[in-house]
Each structure stands twice: as structure tokens, then as C-alpha cells.
């Protein structure tokens, strides 16, 4: 009798995002919060990658020659700016519908991005390695966090980086990111996040340690309703980002 293979795929999550995939590139649509959040995370990624790999952030293509993986890439909101900055980008998502949307938009934008409808564990099993792994707003949607973090961590080259952005598992996050954002303000479709699947920073740190990655930075990201913008913060109670590296 064969053992059932472990997977990080949550079928209900894939169905949810596939259903609204056509709206990925509508800045006023279902993914408006990600469009608003994007400048903050892009600036952080560019700053840290340029510092790590001794690149001039003011150069037109400072990420030239670096291999990026955006896991759970959705419609490509991070893949496209990374490609414009010169990175060689693989965008992977378990939703084939998301990948089709991403491919069409990249073609319309004349960008060469390698989009694949696949999983983190399949890529890791194939021996894929990257200078930078972007694990952004996805860990809270997988069925097996330990397996997902193990698979994504395994793909970080020696000297490489992994960025993780997610939502903390706190009562404050439940009130703001779920009740507030999904039920009161309706920024996101109801059911986008489940409280029990949210991940605490210390849980990510434990996963990094197990995978021989070293945590090098962590910060909160908070929303300013007056400016309708997201900003870096010391407050990690709701949205936060962490950065880890694999020693060279």
C-alpha cells in the first residue's frame, strides 16, 4: 500500500483565487489591497536584494543575472516589476487560471517571464535553485505550512535570500485583516483568510532554522487610511515581512 503524497495545495484556496483571477490587474477590483501594498514590498525587495548582491539600485536593470522565484505568483503583480528590473523570473502558482492570466498580461507587456502552473514541492523535487525566493502573501493559504516552508527554503541558493510576507495570528489581525477588511470594508472577498491558517513570526523563524536559513530582518507593514497607503512599521501585529538568507 502506498502512502499518500503530502501536498501544500488547499483545493478550496485554489478554487477561491481561480474564481476571481480575471481581476488580478484591475487596481480597483478584488485585488485592490495588493495593488496598494505592492509599492511598499517592491521597494523593500529591491533595497535588500541590491544591498545583498552589491547592485546599484539606481541602475536601470539592477537585478540583471539574478534568478528569482515568485511562489504563489497569482496574476504576476510581483513578477512583472522584478522582470523589468532585469531579474530572470519564474512565477509559479497552483492555479492554472492564475497562470493563464499572468501569461497573457506579460505578453501584452512584452515581458519574458517563465510562468508555471505547479507547486513549491514539485519545483523543489526538480532541484530548482534561486538567488531570491519571493514567498509573499501565500503561506497563509497553503494546507501544510511546514512542508511549504521546507520546499521553498530548499530552493534558496547558498548566499541567496528568501522574503516572506504574511499576516500574524493575533486578535488584532483577526479584527483588522479579516473582520475589518473582508466583512466591514469589503476590500477582499469574504473567506479570503482563515484565522487558524495565519502564521506567527516565530513559527517562520523556526522553519528557517530547521532549513538552515538565517533570519536577517523583520518588520511590520501598516495601513494609513488618510493617505490610503501602506508603510513600513515596527508593528508586526497584523501584516509583516521577514527576510532570511542561506549562508554562502
From Swiss-Prot:
GO terms for molecular function: 2-polyprenyl-6-hydroxyphenol methylase activity; 3-demethylubiquinol 3-O-methyltransferase activity; polyprenyldihydroxybenzoate methyltransferase activity. It holds the Pfam family Methyltransf_23. S-adenosyl-L-methionine binds at residues 41, 72, 93, 136. GO terms for biological process: methylation. Keywords: Methyltransferase, S-adenosyl-L-methionine, Transferase, Ubiquinone biosynthesis. SUPFAM superfamilies: S-adenosyl-L-methionine-dependent methyltransferases. CDD domains: AdoMet_MTases. Signal peptide: none annotated. Its EC number is 2.1.1.222, 2.1.1.64. InterPro entries: SAM-dependent_MTases_sf, UbiG_MeTrfase. It comes from the Bacteria. Pathway: Cofactor biosynthesis; ubiquinone biosynthesis. Gene3D superfamilies: Vaccinia Virus protein VP39. Disulfide bonds: none annotated. It catalyses: a 3-demethylubiquinol + S-adenosyl-L-methionine = a ubiquinol + S-adenosyl-L-homocysteine + H(+); a 3-(all-trans-polyprenyl)benzene-1,2-diol + S-adenosyl-L-methionine = a 2-methoxy-6-(all-trans-polyprenyl)phenol + S-adenosyl-L-homocysteine + H(+). Belongs to the methyltransferase superfamily. UbiG/COQ3 family. O-methyltransferase that catalyzes the 2 O-methylation steps in the ubiquinone biosynthetic pathway. This is Ubiquinone biosynthesis O-methyltransferase. It comes from Brucella canis (strain ATCC 23365 / NCTC 10854 / RM-666).
Amino acid at each position: 500500500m502506498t502512502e499518500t503524497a503530502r501536498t501544500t495545495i488547499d483545493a478550496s484556496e485554489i478554487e477561491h483565487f481561480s474564481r476571481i483571477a480575471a481581476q488580478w490587474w484591475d487596481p480597483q477590483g478584488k485585488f485592490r489591497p495588493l495593488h496598494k501594498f505592492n509599492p511598499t514590498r517592491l521597494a523593500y525587495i529591491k533595497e535588500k536584494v541590491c544591498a545583498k548582491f552589491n547592485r546599484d539600485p539606481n541602475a536601470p536593470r539592477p537585478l540583471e543575472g539574478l534568478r528569482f522565484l515568485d511562489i504563489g505568483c497569482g496574476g504576476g503583480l510581483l513578477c512583472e516589476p522584478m522582470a523589468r528590473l532585469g531579474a530572470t523570473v519564474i512565477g509559479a502558482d497552483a492555479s492554472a487560471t492564475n497562470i493563464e492570466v499572468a501569461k497573457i498580461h506579460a505578453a501584452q507587456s512584452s515581458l519574458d517571464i517563465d510562468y508555471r502552473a505547479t507547486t513549491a514541492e514539485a519545483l523543489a523535487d526538480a532541484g530548482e535553485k534561486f538567488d531570491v525566493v519571493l514567498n509573499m502573501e501565500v503561506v497563509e493559504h497553503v494546507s501544510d505550512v511546514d512542508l511549504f516552508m521546507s520546499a521553498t527554503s530548499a530552493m534558496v541558493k547558498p548566499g541567496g535570500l528568501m522574503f516572506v510576507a504574511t499576516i500574524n495570528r493575533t486578535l488584532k489581525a483577526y479584527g483588522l485583516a479579516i473582520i475589518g477588511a473582508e466583512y466591514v470594508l469589503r476590500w477582499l472577498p469574504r473567506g479570503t483568510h482563515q484565522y487558524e491558517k495565519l502564521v506567527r513570526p516565530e513559527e517562520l523563524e523556526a522553519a528557517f532554522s530547521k532549513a538552515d536559513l538565517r533570519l536577517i530582518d523583520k518588520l511590520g507593514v501598516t495601513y494609513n487610511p488618510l493617505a490610503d497607503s501602506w508603510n513600513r512599521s515596527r508593528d508586526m501585529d497584523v501584516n509583516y515581512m521577514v527576510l532570511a538568507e542561506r549562508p554562502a
